[in-house]
C-alpha cells in the first residue's frame, strides 16, 4: 500500500562511501536530507580491503577533507597503521595510506550521520524513481513508501543486480552476502539508461591466530604518523604492523591445475574486472614468468582476529582457496574464516552524466560511486561529495561546482568518466593527471579549502588558519628573495659537511635553497625567520622554491587549457548539421555533449581537425540547436 513518507530537499540512496559524503555535504549546506539504506548497520562498511589512501587515492582523501568531507577525519580517528608512500620520490606522487580498524571506522561514520541535524538515516529498499516532466522528484520503496525531493542521488555501489561467484557456485547477492538491489537496476533500464556489467573480487580472510608470523616480513607503520585531515591535532600512537609473504611455485601449480574450475576462465563471469587489481589466478596466467607474487597480511581491526589476505583476490572454489592458502609460507596451518569471491554488478555508463554528476536524461537525478564505473572507496567518496554539493546547489538554485583537471584529482576523475567513459572499473592513478605536480598531497587545502568555505562546509576557525598559513608562506618566500647568505667560513664548513660545494660569493637564500641537498630547515638555521613557520608552511616553501620551474611550466599549460575551457559549446548544439565533422566525431559529440571546446578535445575519437571545424562553426555565431 503506497503512502507518503515525507518531503525532503535531497534523497540519497545507499550508505557506502559515496552516499556518506553526499548526504553530509548536502545536509551541511542546509538541505533537508534523507539517506535510505537497506541495512543501517552496514554504513561505511569496507567490503574489500581494510585501508584508505594510497597513490593518487590518498590525495583524493585530502581533497575531500579540504572541501569539508568526512573520510579523512574518520580514518584519522580509527586507523591501526599510517604510512606515507613514495617518500623517496618527488612530492607529486607522495600519498598517505592507512590501515583501518574497519569496524571502528564504520561506527565512526554512522555516528557522524546520526549527529548531523539536517540528516535522517532510514532503512529502506528503493525500487523505483518518481519521474515527472523528465525530472526526478522522489523515490518509491518496496514497502510502498513514497519519499519526495528536489534532487535524488543514487550511490548503490556493487548492489545493483549483484551476483556473487565462488567456483561453480553463483547466487544473487550484494557484497558480503548482503541483499542485492534488483528492481532499481531494471527500472533504470526502463527509463532508458545504458548499463554496463562490471566485476570485482575480494580475497579470503583468515584467522590471525593460525598464522606463523616468523615466516613473514614485518611491515610497520611510520614512526611519526601524519594525518589525512587538516583538522586532526592528535594522532593514534599504538600502531599494528602488517606482514609480507609470497606465493610459491606450488601455489602457482595449484592454480594452473584448477583453472578449469575458475569462473574467470570458464566463461561463467561475464563482467569486466579491474585492470589494476587482478585476481591471483589472473596474475599467475598473465605473468607466468614471475616465480612469486607478494601477499600482504592486513589485520581488519584491533578487536578481531580476522586478517585480510591482500594480493590473493580470487573466485576459485572454496576447497582450492584452502589449498592455496596453505601453500604460502606462514599460512601452512591457516584457517580460512571467509572465502574470497567475485561479484558482478550493474553500472551506469558515465558518459550519460554531466560534469556535475547529474544525469542528462533525467533532471534532478545524480549518481556517484561504483555505480558510475569506478573502483575504490576514495574514488566513490570523491564523487559522493561532489554529487552532494551539486544536488544542494541545484536545490538552492545556485551555480554548480565543477572542479577542473588542474584543481584536483577529483576533477580529473569526473572529467575522465563523463568525457571518455570507461569499459572497466576505473581506478585513479597519478599518471591520469597531466598537472600532477600541482595536485599534490601537501597542497590540497591551498587548492580547495576556499571552495569548501564558500559552500559552508569549512568553518571560520579552519579558514582563518588557512589564511594565516598562506600569508606565512608568501611572507617567507619574499624574505628568502631578499636575504643574502654570505660565503663565510662557518657557512662553507656546514655545506662541506653535507657534501655541497662551498660558496665562492654571497647568494640569496632562495637561490641556495634550490640546490637539491639544501633543505628549508638548513636555510632557516642559517638565517632564522622572525617567526618560525609551521611544518606545513615550511614544507610548502621548500617545494615551491625547489620545483618553481616545473610548477611554472605546468601553470602555463593550465592557462592554455583554460582558454579552451572558456570556449563554451551550446548544450543543444546540433552536431549532425556541421559539415566536415567526421562521422565518429559526430557520434561521440552527440553522446558526450561536451560543455566546452576543452572537454570536446579530450573525447576519444574526436580529432584535432574536428575541433578546428567545431571552433570555426561556433565562432561564426550562428548555429543550429536540437529540439529539447
Curated annotation (Swiss-Prot):
Cofactors, names only: FAD
Pfam families linked to this entry: GIDA, GIDA_C_1st, SAM_GIDA_C
Gene3D superfamilies named in the record: FAD/NAD(P)-binding domain, GidA associated domain, C-terminal subdomain, tRNA uridine 5-carboxymethylaminomethyl modification enzyme MnmG/GidA
Positions annotated to bind NAD(+): 273-287
Record InterPro entries: FAD/NAD-bd_sf (IPR036188), GIDA_C_N (IPR049312), MnmG (IPR004416), MnmG-rel (IPR002218), MnmG-rel_CS (IPR020595), MnmG_C (IPR026904), MnmG_C_subdom (IPR047001), MnmG_C_subdom_sf (IPR044920)
GO molecular function: flavin adenine dinucleotide binding
Name of the protein in question: tRNA uridine 5-carboxymethylaminomethyl modification enzyme MnmG
Source organism: Exiguobacterium sibiricum (strain DSM 17290 / CCUG 55495 / CIP 109462 / JCM 13490 / 255-15)
Gene transcribed to yield this protein: mnmG
Amino acid at each position: 500500500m503506497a503512502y507518503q513518507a515525507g518531503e525532503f530537499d535531497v534523497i540519497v540512496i545507499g550508505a557506502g562511501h559515496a552516499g556518506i559524503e553526499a548526504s553530509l555535504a548536502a545536509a551541511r549546506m542546509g538541505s533537508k536530507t534523507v539517506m535510505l539504506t537497506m541495512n543501517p548497520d552496514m554504513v561505511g562498511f569496507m567490503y574489500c580491503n581494510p585501508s584508505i589512501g594510497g597513490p593518487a587515492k590518498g590525495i583524493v582523501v585530502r581533497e575531500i577533507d579540504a572541501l569539508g568531507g568526512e573520510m579523512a577525519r574518520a580514518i584519522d580517528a580509527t586507523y591501526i597503521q599510517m604510512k606515507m608512500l613514495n617518500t623517496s620520490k618527488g612530492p607529486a606522487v607522495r600519498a598517505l595510506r592507512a590501515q583501518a580498524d574497519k569496524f571502528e571506522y564504520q561506527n565512526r561514520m554512522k555516528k557522524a550521520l546520526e549527529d548531523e541535524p539536517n540528516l535522517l538515516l532510514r532503512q529502506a529498499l528503493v525500487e523505483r524513481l518518481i519521474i515527472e516532466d523528465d525530472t526526478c522528484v522522489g523515490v518509491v520503496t518496496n514497502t510502498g513508501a513514497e519519499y519526495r525531493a528536489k534532487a535524488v542521488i543514487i550511490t548503490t555501489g556493487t548492489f545493483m543486480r549483484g551476483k556473487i561467484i565462488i567456483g561453480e557456485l553463483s547466487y544473487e547477492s550484494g557484497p558480503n552476502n548482503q541483499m542485492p538491489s534488483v528492481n532499481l537496476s531494471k527500472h533504470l533500464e526502463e527509463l532508458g539508461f545504458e548499463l554496463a556489467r562490471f566485476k570485482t573480487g575480494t580475497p579470503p580472510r583468515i584467522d590471525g591466530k593460525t598464522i606463523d608470523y616468523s615466516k613473514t616480513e614485518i611491515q610497520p607503520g611510520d614512526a611519526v604518523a601524519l594525518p589525512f585531515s587538516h583538522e586532526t591535532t592528535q594522532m593514534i600512537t599504538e600502531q599494528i604492523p602488517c606482514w609480507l609473504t609470497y606465493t610459491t611455485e606450488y601455489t602457482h601449480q595449484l592454480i594452473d591445475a584448477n583453472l578449469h574450475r575458475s569462473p574467470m576462465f570458464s566463461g561463467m563471469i561475464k563482467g569486466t574486472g579491474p585492470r589494476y587489481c587482478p585476481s591471483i589466478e589472473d596474475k599467475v596466467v598473465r605473468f607466468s614468468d614471475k616465480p612469486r607474487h607478494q601477499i600482504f597480511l592486513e589485520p581488519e581491526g584491533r578487536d578481531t582476529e580476522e586478517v585480510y589476505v591482500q594480493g590473493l583476490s580470487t573466485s576459485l572454489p572454496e576447497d582450492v582457496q584452502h589449498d592455496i592458502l596453505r601453500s604460502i609460507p606462514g599460512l601452512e596451518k591457516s584457517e580460512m574464516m571467509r572465502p574470497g569471491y567475485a561479484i558482478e554488478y550493474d553500472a551506469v555508463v558515465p558518459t550519460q552524466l554531466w560534469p556535475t554528476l547529474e544525469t542528462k536524461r533525467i533532471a534532478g537525478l545524480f549518481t556517484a560511486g561504483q555505480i558510475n564505473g569506478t573502483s575504490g572507496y576514495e574514488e566513490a567518496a570523491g564523487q559522493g561529495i561532489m554529487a552532494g554539493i551539486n544536488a544542494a546547489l541545484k536545490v538552492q538554485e545556485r551555480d554548480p561546482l565543477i572542479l577542473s583537471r588542474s584543481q584536483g584529482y577529483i576533477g580529473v576523475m569526473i572529467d575522465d568518466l563523463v568525457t571518455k567513459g570507461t569499459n572497466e572499473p576505473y581506478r585513479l592513478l597519478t599518471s591520469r593527471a597531466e598537472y600532477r605536480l600541482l595536485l599534490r598531497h601537501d597542497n590540497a587545502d591551498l587548492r580547495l579549502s576556499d571552495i569548501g568555505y564558500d559552500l559552508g562546509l569549512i568553518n571560520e576557525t579552519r579558514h582563518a588558519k588557512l589564511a594565516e598559513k598562506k600569508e606565512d608562506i608568501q611572507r617567507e618566500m619574499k624574505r628568502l628573495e631578499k636575504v643574502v647568505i654570505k660565503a663565510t667560513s662557518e657557512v662553507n664548513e656546514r655545506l662541506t659537511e653535507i657534501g655541497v660545494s662551498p660558496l665562492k660569493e654571497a647568494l640569496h637564500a632562495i637561490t641556495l635553497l634550490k640546490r637539491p641537498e639544501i633543505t628549508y630547515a638548513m636555510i632557516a638555521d642559517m638565517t632564522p625567520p622572525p617567526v618560525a613557520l609551521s611544518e606545513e608552511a615550511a614544507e610548502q616553501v621548500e617545494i615551491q622554491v625547489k620545483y618553481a620551474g616545473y610548477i611554472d611550466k605546468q601553470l602555463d599549460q593550465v592557462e592554455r587549457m583554460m582558454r579552451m575551457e572558456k570556449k563554451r559549446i551550446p548544450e543543444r548544439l546540433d552536431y549532425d548539421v556541421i559539415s566536415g565533422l567526421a562521422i565518429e566525431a559526430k557520434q561521440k559529440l552527440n553522446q558526450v555533449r561536451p560543455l566546452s571546446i576543452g572537454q570536446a578535445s579530450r573525447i576519444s575519437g574526436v580529432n584535432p581537425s574536428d575541433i578546428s571545424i567545431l571552433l570555426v562553426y561556433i565562432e561564426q555565431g550562428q548555429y543550429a540547436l536540437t529540439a529539447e
